[in-house]
Curated annotation (Swiss-Prot):
Bone. The gene is Bglap2. This is Osteocalcin-2. Ca(2+) 1 binds at residues 69, 75. Disulfide bonds join 68-74. One of its GO terms (molecular function) is structural constituent of bone. Its main location: secreted.
Length: 95
């Protein structure tokens, strides 16, 4: 068993150290795998455009939240039940 393991290891080492990795395939198929730098830059630049907004959009409920914070009753209710419910109970307006 020990000799079989040693032979397998030596065969694997010989395979790794052989010059098969330096061989290049011949034919037109080998050129299709690579692209020029200009084509590669076009692909990279195209993907960067769709990253999204650089800053987050403003919260639409921020003015409502500020108005509710100024009223102590609304502020207390918003802590217990949530902003929408508290604003509706105090001001009677649906957000």
């Amino acid at each position: 068993m020990r000799t079989l393991s040693l032979l397998t290891l030596l065969a694997l080492a010989a395979l790794c150290l052989s010059d098969l990795t330096d061989a290049k395939p011949s034919g037109p198929e080998s050129d299709k795998a690579f692209m020029s730098k200009q084509e590669g830059n076009k692909v990279v630049n195209r993907l960067r455009r769709y990253l999204g907004a650089s800053v987050p959009s403003p919260d639409p409920l921020e003015p409502t939240r500020e108005q509710c914070e100024l009223n102590p009753a609304c502020d207390e209710l918003s802590d217990q039940y949530g902003l929408k419910t508290a604003y509706k109970r105090i001001y009677g307006i649906t957000i």
